[in-house]
């Protein structure tokens, strides 16, 4: 998707198609890396002496070539990827997807060593900075950037509990399932579950409790209203990798948050 904000700030913006197919799954390089490359990348990245910032390990297919071209290289790490994919494999119900996530985790653990060639690692999570600094120094902690400059949560009380996230991600769907079995089925307070592409089994499970409502694929304005009007945000997770941007959103724009320490 073209980004108007980037185009306002940058001299040039190049867009590359995301590749797909079984042949990329069979490669030694992780699928999330090998499908994010293009024949035009060398021409665009190596034609000058400017530094290169790779946004996430998955974007680093050109890292080694940039290093050989004596360009300064920085990598913004979103999380410890192989741990994240391991947790996805544990949460996944579909057998093929479970195998994919497990194999991807192993490939990512091997591939991660490419970070040793970078000049700097810029970690998004304070609790993961030590991991990267010990293995691929130097690593710096730079917090997540977001649109908020002050806390602007509403006063008073809301009418429901809110659980939200990308529900197509196994980790998030599994978190709802855990909450439904241990908490939501024992209360009668209205609960709204909102997020992208909820799987059919999640809709069936939510339908067992009359006080639970699922709002699939809300647009940005609808999601913003749901966050602001909720009384309590249920922010449960089974893994501690990376940073939870939805927690930052709820803290700045919502009311009360119930969180856990994985």
Regions inferred by a protein language model and the residue ranges of each:
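A short, charged, and often flexible helix/loop element on the N-terminal side
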Residues: 11-42, 93-101
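Membrane-proximal helix-turn-helix segments that form the acceptor-binding/catalytic region
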Residues: 39-46, 80-84, 92-121
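Short N-terminal targeting/anchoring amphipathic segment
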Residues: 43-61, 74
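Active-site proximal beta-strand in glycosyltransferases
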Residues: 69-91
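Donor nucleotide-sugar binding/catalytic pocket of nucleotide-sugar-dependent glycosyltransferases
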Residues: 101-151
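Conserved catalytic-core segment of nucleotide-activated headgroup transferases in glycan assembly
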Residues: 141-208, 212-228
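Acidic donor-binding loop of glycosyltransferase active sites
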Residues: 227-242, 253-256
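Short hydrophobic beta-strand element within catalytic cores of glycosyltransferases
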Residues: 246-249, 256-261
């Amino acid at each position: 998707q073209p980004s108007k904000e980037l185009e306002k700030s940058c001299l040039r913006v190049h867009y590359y198609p995301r590749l797909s197919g079984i042949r990329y799954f069979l490669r030694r390089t992780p699928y999330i890396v090998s499908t994010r490359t293009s024949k035009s990348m060398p021409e665009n990245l190596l034609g000058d002496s400017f530094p290169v910032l790779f946004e996430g390990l998955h974007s680093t297919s050109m890292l080694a070539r940039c290093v050989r071209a004596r360009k300064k290289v920085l990598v913004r790490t979103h999380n410890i990827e192989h741990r994240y994919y391991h947790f996805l494999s544990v949460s996944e119900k579909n057998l093929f997807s479970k195998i994919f996530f497990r194999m991807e985790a192993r490939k990512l653990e091997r591939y991660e060593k490419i970070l040793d060639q970078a000049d700097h690692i810029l970690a998004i999570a304070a609790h993961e900075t030590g991991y990267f600094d010990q293995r691929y120094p130097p690593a710096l902690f730079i917090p997540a950037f977001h649109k908020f400059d002050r806390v602007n949560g509403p006063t008073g009380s809301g009418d429901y509990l809110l659980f939200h996230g990308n529900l197509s991600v196994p980790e998030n769907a599994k978190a709802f399932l855990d909450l439904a079995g241990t908490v939501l089925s024992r209360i009668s307070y209205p609960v709204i579950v909102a997020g992208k592409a909820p799987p059919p089994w999640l809709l069936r499970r939510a339908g067992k409790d009359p006080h639970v409502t699922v709002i699939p694929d809300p647009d940005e304005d609808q999601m913003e209203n749901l966050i602001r009007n909720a009384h309590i945000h249920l922010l449960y997770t089974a893994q501690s990798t990376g940073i939870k941007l939805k927690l930052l959103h709820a803290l700045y724009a919502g009311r009360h948050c119930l969180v856990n320490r994985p």
